[in-house]
Amino acid sequence: MSEPIKPRIDFEQPLEPPQEPVLRANVAFDEQQAEHFFPAAPELQQEEEEGRAEGIINAALKPKRSLWRKMVTAGLTLFGVSVVAQGVQWVHTAWVQQDWIAMGGGVAGGLIVFAGVGSVVTEWRRLYRLRQRAEERDVARELLHSHGLGKGREFCEKLARQAGLDQGHPALQRWQASLHETQNDREVVALYAKLVQPVLDNQARREISRSAAESTLMIAVSPLAVVDMAFIAWRNIRLINRIAALYGIELGYFSRLRLFRLVLLNIAFAGASELVREVGMDWMSQDLAARLSARAAQGIGAGLLTARLGIKAMELCRPLPWLEGEKPKLGDFRSQLIGQLKDTMKKSDNKAK
C-alpha cells in the first residue's frame, strides 16, 4: 500500500542563502617575529599559570621593606663601619704606645671580622648560584622553542661542566656524536635532555627512592612520635642537600633555607589534591586501609611526602625544564614503598611466630 501524499507547505518568507563566515584580514610576519613564533601548547600555558600563581604567593610571603627596616639596616651599617674604624685606631694607638697585649686583641678581633665577612661573601655566592639556576632554566626554556643556531651547544656544554661530566663520559660522547651542523638550538637542547640529563636524574631518583623507603620503614616501626619527626626532618634536609650536590649546586646556610622554603612553597601551591588523586584511588582499589595497620599507613604517607619533597627539589635544581613524560610522579615510588613495607611486615610476623 502506497503512502499518502503529504500536503503542500507554503512559506511566508523566501529562504535566505547561507551566510559565509567573516574572515579576519591576513597578518604578515617579518623574519624576526617568525623566529620567535611557536604554536600555543596547553602544558606551557599551565606552567605559566603555575609560575604566575607561585609568584603571587612569593610576593605575599615576602616581607615588605618598611621605613623602620631601612632605618635598622642603615644603623647596623653605620655601627659596623664605626667598629672597624675604632679597631683600626685602637691597633694604631697600641702600636705607637707599644701596648702589645692590646694590639694582639685588636688583631684577633680583626681576624674574626675578616672571617665573618668571608663567610657572608661565600653565602652570598652560593645564594647567587641558586638564583642563577632558575635563570638557566628560563634560558633553556627559550632555547627549546628557538629555531636559531649556535647557542644551544654552548649552553649544553656549560651545563655539562657544571655537573662535573668530563669529555670522556659515555652519555656526553653520545650526545656529541648525534649533533649535526643543520640542527637548531631546540634540537640540540632536546638531545641533551634525552641523552645526558637522565644520567643525573636517575641518580636523584635513586636518592629519593632510598630516602622515601627509610622514612616509610622508620615511621612504621617507631613507637615515638618525637623521634619520627626529628628523623624525617633530618632525612628531608639531607635529601635536599644530596640532590642539590648532584646537580652541581653547593648550598650554604641561607641558600639551603631558601631552597627548602621554595620546595615547601611549591608543595603548598600544588596542594594535597595531586597526592589524593595519585594515591587515593590506588589505595581504595587495593583496600590497603583494611590490611595495613595505622602505623604502616602513616609510614607510607610519610614516605610519599618525602618522595614529593625530593621531586620538587629536583625540579628546582635541574638546569632544564621537564619535557613531556619526564617528570617523575608519586606513582613511580608508591608501589615500591608498599612492596618494601609488606616485606618488612611479613618478616616481622615470621619472627614473631
Curated annotation (Swiss-Prot):
Pfam family, one: DUF697
The keyword Transmembrane belongs to this UniProt entry's keyword annotation: yes
Family as reported in the entry's similarity comment: Belongs to the UPF0283 family.
Entry's transmembrane regions: 71-91, 101-121, 214-234
Keywords: Cell inner membrane, Cell membrane, Membrane, Transmembrane, Transmembrane helix
GO cellular component, one term: plasma membrane
Keyword tRNA-binding: no
The name this protein goes by in its record: UPF0283 membrane protein Spro_2618
UniProt-annotated location(s): Cell inner membrane
Organism: Serratia proteamaculans (strain 568)
Membrane topology: Multi-pass membrane protein
Chief location of this protein within or outside the cell: membrane
